[in-house]
């Protein structure tokens, strides 16, 4: 009977499908990122990661060899979201400004990973290396001596990572409470900040600091044929 045969065929197809989505590096990376976001970096173990994916730990090792490799996948996922397009089309200062804001925004959403990513080698992380390659090419085109580029990038990254924390600082971080009389200059400066209510303004602080760094870095350059792009 055609109807019976079709029903049997559908049952067989359903029975042959895995009970869970097929595991992949992308699934592992996303699950690891969720785990860190929820419980912190120390919660990221291969056993907990496997449990969150509802698979045996041995299944993970078909895709990743270690926790270090999982971290590289996370690093690549995050760095792949940093906008480096400006280095192809914008003057150097504007490109660095755009890159810096994008970089800070990506990592301000993943604070527990900053201490890890900041110390993680980029070895075998293609998206991370792609990001650094675009930045390096932008610096070269602006006339930067090759031997000074990485130092400049590291200096910028140090500021960017710290500023990512400030995005998450409480609005009243500079409230002096009942000690206004003991800190008249500081209290007045807080009150006169861009926000009339004295709230923490991470964007204003970051823009000010990044502009100062860009100006300062540009000032260290020797005169070069492409310095007009600064």
Identify the meaning behind each predicted range:
Residues 1-23, 185, 189-197, 225-230:
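N-terminal intrinsically disordered/low-complexity leader segments
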Residues 28-36, 74, 78, 103, ...:
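Short hydrophobic clusters on alpha-helical segments that form packing/core surfaces
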Residues 131-180, 217-221:
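Hydrophobic alpha-helical bundle segments that form small-molecule/ligand-binding pockets
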Residues 84-130, 146, 156:
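Hydrophobic alpha-helical connector segments
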Residues 27, 31-69, 73:
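Helix-turn-helix
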Residues 167-201:
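A surface-exposed regulatory interaction patch that couples sensing to output
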Residues 203-230:
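C-terminal all-alpha effector/ligand-binding and dimerization domain
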């Amino acid at each position: 009977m055609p109807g019976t045969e079709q029903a049997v065929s559908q049952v067989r197809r359903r029975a042959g499908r895995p009970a869970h989505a097929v595991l992949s590096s992308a699934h592992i990376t996303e699950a690891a990122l969720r785990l860190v976001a929820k419980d912190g970096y120390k919660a990221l173990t291969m056993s907990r990661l496997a449990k969150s994916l509802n698979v045996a730990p041995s299944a993970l090792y078909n895709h990743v060899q270690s926790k270090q490799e999982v971290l590289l996948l996370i690093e690549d996922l995050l760095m792949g979201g940093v906008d480096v397009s400006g280095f192809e089309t914008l003057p150097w200062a504007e490109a660095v400004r755009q890159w810096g804001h994008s970089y800070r925004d990506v990592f301000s959403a993943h604070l527990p990973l900053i201490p890890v990513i900041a110390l993680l080698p980029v070895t075998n992380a293609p998206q991370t290396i792609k990001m650094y390659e675009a930045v390096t090419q932008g610096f070269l085109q602006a006339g930067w001596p090759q031997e000074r580029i990485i130092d400049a990038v590291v200096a910028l990254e140090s500021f960017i990572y710290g500023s990512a924390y400030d995005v998450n600082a409480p609005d009243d971080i500079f409230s002096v409470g009942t000690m206004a009389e003991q800190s008249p200059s500081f209290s007045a400066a807080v009150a006169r900040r861009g926000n009339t209510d004295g709230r923490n303004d991470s964007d204003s602080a970051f823009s000010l600091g990044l502009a100062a760094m860009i100006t300062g870095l540009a000032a260290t350059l020797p005169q070069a044929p492409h310095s007009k792009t600064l």
